[in-house]
């Protein structure tokens, strides 16, 4: 027998839309309250506006890409797996496709089609924009409603799906986290994750806009390697960004950046000895060329221009003039070019928030609060975050779906 609970969902992003749909399908009367002027505002900027809505991998692979509290997500991913989400979105009238790295996008390449598909599935329910919630009303340890500007809206269950504090321009200003604290929940330290890094040295800024491919980025904390991956990186006006850097920022989101030592291996396919032999060969094949004219065979031209200074070698020297010590510095810098991190960029540029409502205080099988009956959490509000590639949106959709279904049914199950 289906429930007839009145479920209020605070937040109309990916988690809120999913919660509303699954609560509705479980028989609940749904009111979704979004303080922005439209639903799914953050969805519109995900995947560069194309909405990388999930990753077409199995659950075990998925969990390996979750950085904090992956096991907490087992129930949510069993309820709505990546395969289930693709099927759901297709059934809602938004065909999907799988691209490089198993990233799933709408065929149209328009994020708006994803949010529209969910909204079309919610016809007949109360969906309100420009609706700011001031707090959650609780009596005797049980949710009784939400406080609006002008009144109390009574309900049987509340799902907080207001997001974290990343990209605050999209409305993610931490409202739900404040409500959670007011209700006695622990909110772990919040840090920006999947975010560019600021570098002390000046030379990365000289290379602003240059993208390096097939390089290896290594990070050590107190001389212990914590991250070592190959891929792509981008130099910016403040430091570094790109896929490798965003992943690194996720792995070390809780670290003190002053303890982190970064290094670039510009030729990871070659060992130190192989690279030294390659440099010697290049020198031997062009004995009259200056160093600055030899380096473009090894590096992008813009980087080749500044590289001699990084090695403290005169760029006009010919191979015969380069000492063994200087050649060693050149090879050493190609294999291990150090950078000093001064910090991560702020929440304004972070893809996701590291930290949130402590999962120790939330029941993973239902996503209901262990402190307040009828209070549920979904999405980025929870202390769970993952790498790029559709993983964080999947977390939002899956936790939203489970919370929505649980909120619709929880009183019925208690009375059974």
What is each model feature region?
Residues 8-10, 33, 133, 153-168, ...:
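Short hydrophobic core segments
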Residues 78-157:
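Feature captures the FAD/FMN-dependent oxidoreductase FAD-binding
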